[in-house]
Amino acid sequence: LEAKKAGAKFIYIDPMYCESAAALDAEWLPIRPATDMPFMFGLAYAMLEQDDKEGIIDWDFLNKCTVGFDADHMPADAKDNKNFKDYVMGTYDGTPKTPEWASEICGIDADAIRKLAVTMGKKNKVAFLSSAANARVNNVDSLPQLVMTIGAMGGHMGKSGHMTGTTMHCTSGNGGYALVTNGKDGLPKIENPVDDAINGNEVWDAILNGHYKFTGTGHYDPAEQSAIDIHVIYRNGGNKLNTNGGMAKGIEAFLKVDMVVSHAQFYTTSARYSDIVLPISTEWERAHGLIGGNLVHKSNREMVQAYERIIDPLFESKSDQDIACELGEKLGLKKEDIYPFDAEQQFFNVLTSMKVIDADGKTEKNAVKVTDDDIKALGVEGSAQDGELEYTELMKRGVYQVERHVGDNYGYIALEDFCKDPEKNPVDTPSGKLEIYSQSWADMVNAIGWSSIEPIPTYIPVVNGYESSFADWDSKTPGEYPLQVINPHYLRRAHTAFDNVSWLREAWTNPVFISREDAAAAGIVDGDTVLLTSPVGKCVRPATVTARVRPGVVALPHGAWVQVDEETGIDQAGADNYLIAQTPTGAAVSGYNSAL
């Protein structure tokens, strides 16, 4: 909102015009789900097409900082000579990726793509930002490369006012090294003796059918088919049954195994289908804690929150650590071998190893001052130390926040040093540069073996994507499932959390959002109860007819706790993953937003 006040213009590319876009008065380009890659190929073509006239492309940046854009800048490890520019121009397949070609697939008008290409030019300060939604799609393993490539074409990296990357909730405008970090609890590291994992797209089939692809844990070996016989599901967090695709299969898997055990604070979907539920205490029932953290940092870049117990643990609830110790004792293990010291000592260890960056932007210092009296009050072992904020003051405030002001030394521009001198400041790739052609990425994805990709981004029709909605693409004959479904986040929930809160359920009724055009064609009016049918499930929801969803798309909010009618198999709650198939492709990223 501050950027809007300062005059920034926002362009929003999404199948649904969300509340954030409305608040920013954003121009809307209503794209079809799972078509971001053809859209960006059309955008790249339009940037090349108009470059001579408009001066759009930053050729100096491309030539200096990237490999693989054109034939003159290929990486040393390339196994073929295909480059991005020639692919976009149609040299290899005879199909130029024109805005008209892109428009037929993505639904955005070709003229709008050309207009955006000019906006993306090097003369403008542009933040080209992508959420994770367009990556949660089948067959888009090269999408991050393509986002990077479009940003690089305009030179939108490494300098003030220019950004290319991801943006979502806690990582929106929050890049750079952490200014204050949580410390370490001091617990010894436990090595995992099992070098194995089951991909989320295969987990239910692995239980039901007894086979899966093995690729290793924390690395990717060439995949091999392996047999497995799972008898117990033990869950110690999350709500996997509700958040994984193929929920109907998941329920079947939960019912098949001999036993399901769940740690749970609330009676979630996963807990409801469990045989044993171990009640877990909430953070409000625990002695102390420090909360920081997002997908990038161990903490929010500028802040760590601190809390103390509000109430004693209710009923029979225990912490996960207490349950682990009690189960361990029943298995003949000593408590001190599982957790050598208690939660209070762990908290103290984290507290005294918290670090903050000094005003010079470089020097690391102790964040918290601890006295001998503090140590005595906590009942822990340790030494007093100096720090920037007294422990008692931290707990009184409930937050440690680094003060910011204009001109401080905490600013951060990603890749700034690399962009100024890529030879002296290489990035962590085989070439040391941004790899528009990435042999290592293609080799890894292809070794996993669900489907193959090329080292440069290329368009692969998406399984369960827009083209799949037609019985015949050339004649545009609709198929059995002509609508695409997306699962936007919704004000009632954070993922699946809070769906049991009655006030929120009353305020936000979890409808299915449908366009005016599609509603009129189906004879649906606002408030009608409708049946949604996909290849893998059915649910009923009230309809909200709106102009904020593009035609051909319905939006079923993410995270409702499933309520299956056992006689009909129809979900009464509108759980999005009850309608979504598990279809591993490429590196097997879950294709939540490629669904019909």
Description of each model-found segment:
Residues K53-L62, A127, G158-G165, K335-D342:
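Flexible, glycine/charged-enriched surface loops at secondary-structure junctions
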Residues C65-T66, T119-M120, M163-N174, P340-M354, ...:
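A glycine-rich phosphate-binding loop feature that marks nucleotide/adenosyl-phosphate handling sites
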Residues L29-A34, H73-A78, Y92, P99, ...:
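Hydrophobic alpha-helical scaffolding
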Residues L1-I13, M37-F39, M148-R272, T282, ...:
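Extended redox/cofactor-interaction regions of prokaryotic respiratory oxidoreductases
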Residues D77-N209:
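Active-site phosphate/pyrophosphate-binding segments
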Residues L24-I31, S281, E285-I291, E302-P313:
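Short beta-alpha connecting loops at secondary-structure transitions
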Residues K4-G7, I11, M16-K123:
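Long, well-ordered, tryptophan-enriched scaffold segments
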Residues E308-I310, E316, D320-K376, G382-Q385, ...:
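Long, contiguous, secondary-structure-rich segments that constitute the structural scaffold
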